[in-house]
């Protein structure tokens, strides 16, 4: 397992201090929404998706997942966030005496503007399209759609933050995943052993890219999550890295 260290460059010390001051807890209030499901009990249709995670079993997310409507998806920045969801106000379809579920956002539920009044994922509606396994944990399968309440909760992850390298020498893409606590990444900086820190561009989901050629250099990352907490991973990836490889840090948020 690759190691990460907290040797913070002076230029970034101020940034870290500001981020620490801006840290705030996740909102514990419950909010109204609706939920449906897609796929089957094995989760075949829930794999891949608009967050870039690929095989959700391999990446550690399993079937405890959901797609988000436009109002919640935030153009992919919300990928990786965790939600606690409970079925409410429907005695016919809500299962009784069951605990709320906790799911991770791994996909996008697209709007259908040809059905402005009949598509639950159209803005401004807040909607969760759950895996079938998760939906049937809180509601009866035949319901199809149920009213729910949700709130953000910390993500519990095993191991460190993971970085998967994709693309080519002139368009390096990095998937950042297995992020604990807030779960969703707000910004990413990258540094080669022979280059300065540079911001990465949000590509899609939790995939970030840069046009800087960093082949043959050690790679360091500076990651900020949506709660404004920041961590630096110095020389996490050795200079002999290859596209398609995944590297795990020794710590997490």
Spans of features found by a protein language model:
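Folded extracytoplasmic luminal domains of secretory or organellar precursors
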Residues: 2-253
């Amino acid at each position: 397992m690759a190691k990460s260290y907290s040797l913070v460059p002076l230029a970034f010390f101020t940034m870290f201090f500001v981020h620490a001051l801006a840290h705030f807890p996740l909102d514990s209030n419950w909010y109204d929404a609706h939920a449906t499901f897609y796929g089957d009990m094995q989760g075949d249709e829930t794999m891949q998706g608009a967050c870039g995670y690929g095989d959700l079993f391999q990446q550690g997310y399993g079937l405890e997942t959901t797609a988000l409507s436009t109002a919640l998806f935030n153009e992919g920045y919300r990928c990786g966030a965790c939600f606690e969801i409970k079925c409410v106000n429907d005695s016919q379809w809500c299962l009784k005496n069951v605990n709320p579920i906790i799911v991770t956002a791994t996909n996008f539920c697209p709007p259908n503007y040809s059905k402005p009044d009949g598509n639950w994922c159209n803005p401004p509606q807040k909607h969760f399209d759950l895996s079938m396994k998760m939906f049937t944990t809180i509601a009866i399968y035949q319901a199809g759609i149920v009213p729910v309440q949700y709130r953000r909760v910390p993500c519990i992850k095993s191991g460190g933050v993971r970085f998967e390298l994709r693309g080519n020498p002139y368009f390096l893409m990095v998937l950042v995943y297995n992020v604990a606590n807030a779960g969703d990444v707000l910004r990413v900086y990258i540094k080669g052993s022979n280059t300065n820190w540079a911001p990465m561009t949000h590509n899609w989901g939790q995939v970030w890219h840069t046009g800087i050629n960093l082949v043959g250099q050690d790679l360091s990352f500076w990651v900020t999550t949506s709660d404004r907490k920041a961590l630096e991973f110095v020389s996490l990836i050795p200079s002999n890295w290859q596209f398609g490889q995944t590297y795990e840090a020794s710590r997490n948020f």
